[in-house]
Regions:
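Phosphate-handling DNA/RNA-contact segment within nucleic-acid enzymes
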Residues: 1-79
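TOPRIM fold recognition
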Residues: 51-172
Length: 172
């Protein structure tokens, strides 16, 4: 592959810069094998989350938006239409909250969407201060969208039926 997106971000101050010619549709990502996608604002938050929850991390897909734009999410889902569950792990601030609502509305109704809100401003802050967080309560989970449940019709098979001898009331 060839580079399509690059950016610089500061962790101490509000420094954000995208490289010249960077395409927001191609965010920092890991493509896993299962049908779950975890979405973050910045690569540092994505990596911090994996550090906090390393178990089977390779199975899941992870995507950094490079902010709160939905371009990278739409591009990722166009490449991976088999994704069934999206976890929006955006920052715990107004911009993150507003983006979660907007992004959830963009996703098809067949996709389950859950907001995973960090207990601090972002996932890097949670990682840095994890020793101070009681009982590893690093986040709260909020379901934003669930696909409609399909109504199934029960099928009775002959093999499941019970054979009962019947006595005729009259003979034909």
């Amino acid at each position: 592959g060839h580079p399509r997106y690059a950016s610089s971000r500061g962790i101490q101050e509000k420094f954000r810069q995208d490289a010249a010619g960077a395409e927001k549709a191609f965010g920092f990502a890991h493509r896993g094998t299962d049908k779950q996608l975890l979405v973050f604002e910045a690569p540092i938050d994505l990596l911090s989350f994996i550090e906090l929850f390393p178990k089977n991390w390779q199975q899941h897909s992870y995507l950094s938006l490079g902010g709160v734009s939905g371009k990278a999410l739409q591009q990722f889902l166009s490449e991976r239409p088999d994704v069934e569950r999206v976890f929006l792990c955006l920052d715990s601030d107004k911009a993150g909250e507003d983006a979660c609502k907007r992004l959830a509305a963009l996703l098809p109704d067949t996709v389950s969407v859950t907001r995973i809100q960090p207990c601090m401003k972002d996932w890097n802050d949670v990682l840095v201060h994890r020793a101070e967080i009681p009982n590893r309560n690093y986040f709260k989970s909020i379901v934003l969208k669930e696909p409609p449940k399909k109504d199934f019709v029960k099928i009775i098979r002959m093999s499941n039926g019970e054979l009962t001898p019947v006595e005729w009331l009259w003979k034909p």
